[in-house]
Regions:
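Short, Lys/Arg-enriched, Trp-marked, Pro/Gly-tolerant hinge/linker segments that flank
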Residues: 131-140, 153-166, 172-211, 215-222, ...
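Basic, helix-initiating cap at the start of DNA-binding domains
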Residues: 91, 192-195, 292
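A hydrophobic/aromatic-rich effector-binding and dimerization subdomain
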Residues: 4-20, 26-40, 95-154, 172-184
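Short hydrophobic/aromatic patch on the recognition helix
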Residues: 86, 229, 233, 277-278, ...
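Solvent-exposed, amphipathic alpha-helical segments
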Residues: 69, 141-152, 200-208, 252, ...
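Terminal helix-turn-helix DNA-binding modules in bacterial transcription factors
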Residues: 203, 207, 212-219, 224, ...
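N-terminal regulatory/effector-sensing and dimerization cores
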Residues: 40-130
Length: 298
């Protein structure tokens, strides 16, 4: 039997735990990144001339940083946008695109691939916009990381590749902070984490997915009535709190399955009383059983 996500007023959380639900501050990103870490790999830095095409059928994203000059960013459909000021181009998940420049454009680029643990099933990757194009002047909060990154990319210090990879990872995390702080997200998980009240409830689910969280518990953490909390959660995140908890649990299960963990242990870790209960939730979300899903990865 699948462990229910309770929605009634009688919470299964102990009273002592309930007293701790009104948290004053939560780290909205660390619990995500500790479960689904980010990996960057720098593959180009220097003057750029020509056309570079990137496929959309590989499980990775891309970051392109324009330090100087001009490039054209195009899609697989042929449209293109000219970028003629220092800018950041982020494809957080697979997206076919191309970057082009002529000799006269004087383009200087630094490029990296980005991969989240879990690939395209990673909730952070799914939550990001399909692509972001931002002038660097519009994101002053990441200026320090960008300046350091450019200094490494166009220098010749030893260990530069390792430093560049870490700086790209730092930059993406700072960019996530910027997106949540600037209210540029129309909906989804990151928009929920950007909401001061909803983020408290979401972080509880992220930190302790095995607990049978009720709407009453989560509303208490958000300092809202149950009805207001449930309505606002659905409006901002795009699903009910119960459905979000199931989605988060399944995402964690996918990560652990990739690591080769046995499903019996995974079920207990993510809040299900049996492997069959997890398998039912998994099939509803993914369209396949855990065994079938793992076989597809092979």
């Amino acid at each position: 039997m699948e462990l229910p996500v309770k929605v009634g007023s009688n919470s299964p959380i102990y009273a002592a735990d309930r007293l701790n639900l009104r948290v004053k501050h939560v780290d909205r990103l660390s619990s995500l990144l500790s479960n689904f870490s980010l990996h960057a790999s720098t593959f180009y830095s220097g003057g750029f001339c020509g056309v570079a095409a990137y496929p959309g059928d590989v499980p990775r994203g891309y970051v392109h940083l324009l330090r100087a000059g001009r490039v054209t960013l195009g899609s697989s459909h042929g449209e293109g946008v000219v970028i003629d000021e220092p800018s950041l181009m982020l494809m957080g998940r697979p997206l076919a695109h191309r970057v082009s420049a002529s000799d006269e454009d004087g383009a200087e680029l630094v490029c990296a691939t980005i991969e989240f643990d879990g690939g395209v099933d990673n909730p952070l990757s799914r939550a990001l916009p399909e692509y972001l194009l931002l002038p660097l002047s519009a994101v002053p909060s990441i200026a320090g990381a960008i300046d350091w990154l450019f200094s490494e990319a166009f220098g010749d210090d030893c260990g530069r590749e390792a430093v560049l990879d870490r700086l790209f990872e730092l930059m993406v995390i700072q960019l996530l902070r910027h997106l949540m702080a600037s209210n540029q997200l129309s909906g989804g998980m990151l928009a929920g984490l950007a909401n001061p009240r909803l983020s408290k409830a979401m972080t509880l689910m992220h930190d302790a997915p095995a607990k049978p969280w009720s709407v009453a518990d989560l509303a208490l953490a958000a300092n809202m009535s149950r009805a207001s909390f449930a309505a606002q959660f659905r409006e901002v995140v795009g699903m009910t709190p119960a459905d979000y908890l199931v989605s988060w649990r399944v995402s964690l299960a996918q990560k652990r399955l990739r690591e080769g963990r046995p499903i019996a242990l995974i079920a207990d870790e993510v809040g299900y009383e049996s492997p069959s209960a997890l398998a039912r939730a998994f099939r509803r979300k993914v369209g396949a059983s855990p065994r079938e899903w793992v076989q597809r990865l092979a």
